[in-house]
């Protein structure tokens, strides 16, 4: 293959390089994978209304997330077990994020520990958290993330049980024997049993707390001073509850279409959540973001920033740290170009009037003058 010109090209390379079980784990979605496809396709139904003859010789893409200044509103979502993709795993991702001046979110189910990732050098990092049945485990994880200098907790709230990922069932997915879930070493929670199903599904069934509810968000606030992002909100009702719970922010996410199939694409759910949050807390988005144009569309619909997951893992598999750096560079350059061609010189310039959605077409066939 010649020069990589967009982030999607890394997926084909990753598919060639990775064992089938590992590629399928990263790439697949739940059941019919309708939402997996829709996460991408919904972006293609949003069109631009660019403004012209505006001086775009200087463009500022910098963003502030929970008080932290970053170079662009494009961050790295938590993706589990990255050493399956490349021996450097989360180390490489952390270094690439830091070099790009943006935020990495480390998965609870990482193959590198919070301490190891912190040792890669300075950087703004968030820690993604699942709530285990044993709350002592949760407290230990949060304390360790705090000590390692992590700046926020991204609490995943859409996984009381693991979605039915049929590729993982067919492949009997299990973490390869040479790897462990590093954050759980010494807690008897670092390995998965080979089972007649997906090993990860069995692990979740055994360890993750199905009783998790809004009161536990309050409990989490009682054990940490770190801001808590609620990750997995896709309705107005839950957005209002997230605000009421004292969350520092919301991540509109359908878990990469890996949990409940036939939920809307995150970009389709975004405006409802933003409207319900009513500016009280910031709203972020993950799911299906592959282009700078996607980033712009999310910001026009009210997102304060986006997270990318699979593109990072596929680039990691293809080219290690250099691949992740390249993904962040391409996304940044595409986003900057989209801003310029839309007549925007800062994030504050990006408005709802810059895009045209399915809902707009139903409400009025042509924009009012």
Swiss-Prot record:
Its cofactor is FMN. It catalyses: glycolate + O2 = glyoxylate + H2O2. Residues 1-360 form the FMN hydroxy acid dehydrogenase domain. GO terms for cellular component: peroxisome. Keywords: Flavoprotein, FMN, Glycolate pathway, Host-virus interaction, Oxidoreductase, Peroxisome, Photorespiration. Expressed constitutively in leaves (at protein level). Its main location: other. Catalyzes the oxidation of glycolate to glyoxylate, with a reduction of O2 to H2O2. Is a key enzyme in photorespiration in plants. To a lesser extent, is also able to oxidize glyoxylate to oxalate in vitro. Can exert a strong regulation over photosynthesis, possibly through a feed-back inhibition on Rubisco activase. Does not seem to play a role in oxalate accumulation. This is Glycolate oxidase 1. It comes from Oryza sativa subsp. japonica (Rice). The gene is GLO1.
């Amino acid at each position: 293959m010649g020069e990589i010109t967009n982030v999607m090209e890394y997926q084909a390379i990753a598919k060639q390089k990775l064992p089938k079980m590992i590629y399928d784990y990263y790439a697949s979605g739940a059941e019919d994978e309708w939402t997996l496809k829709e996460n991408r396709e919904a972006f293609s139904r949003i069109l631009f209304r660019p403004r012209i003859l505006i001086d775009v010789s200087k463009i500022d893409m910098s963003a502030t997330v929970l008080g932290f200044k970053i170079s662009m509103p494009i961050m790295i979502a938590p993706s589990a077990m990255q050493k399956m993709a490349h021996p450097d795993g989360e180390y490489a991702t952390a270094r690439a994020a830091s070099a790009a001046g943006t935020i990495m979110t480390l998965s609870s189910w990482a193959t590198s520990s919070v301490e190891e990732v912190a040792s890669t050098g300075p950087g703004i990092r968030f820690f993604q958290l699942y709530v285990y049945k044993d709350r002592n485990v949760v407290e230990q994880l949060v304390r360790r993330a705090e000590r390692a200098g992590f700046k926020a907790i991204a609490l995943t709230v859409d996984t009381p049980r693991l979605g039915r990922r049929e590729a993982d069932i067919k492949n009997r997915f299990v973490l390869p024997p040479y790897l462990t879930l590093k954050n759980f070493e010494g807690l008897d929670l670092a390995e998965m049993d080979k089972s007649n199903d997906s090993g990860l599904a069995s692990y979740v069934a055994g360890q993750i707390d199905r009783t998790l509810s809004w009161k536990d968000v309050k409990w989490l606030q009682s054990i940490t001073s770190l801001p808590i992002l609620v990750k997995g909100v896709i309705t107005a009702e839950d957005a209002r509850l997230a605000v009421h719970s004292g969350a520092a922010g919301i991540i509109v996410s359908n878990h990469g279409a890996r949990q409940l199939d036939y939920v809307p694409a995150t970009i389709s759910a975004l405006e409802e959540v933003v409207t319900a949050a009513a500016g009280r807390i910031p709203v972020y988005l993950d799911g299906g973001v592959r282009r700078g144009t996607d980033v712009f569309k999310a910001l026009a619909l009210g997102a304060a920033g986006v997270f990318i997951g699979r593109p990072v893992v596929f680039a990691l598999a293809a080219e290690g740290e250099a691949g992740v750096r390249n993904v962040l560079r391409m996304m940044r350059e595409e986003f900057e170009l989209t801003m310029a061609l839309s007549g925007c010189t800062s994030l504050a310039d990006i408005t709802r009037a810059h895009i045209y959605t399915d809902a707009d077409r139903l409400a009025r066939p042509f924009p009012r003058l």
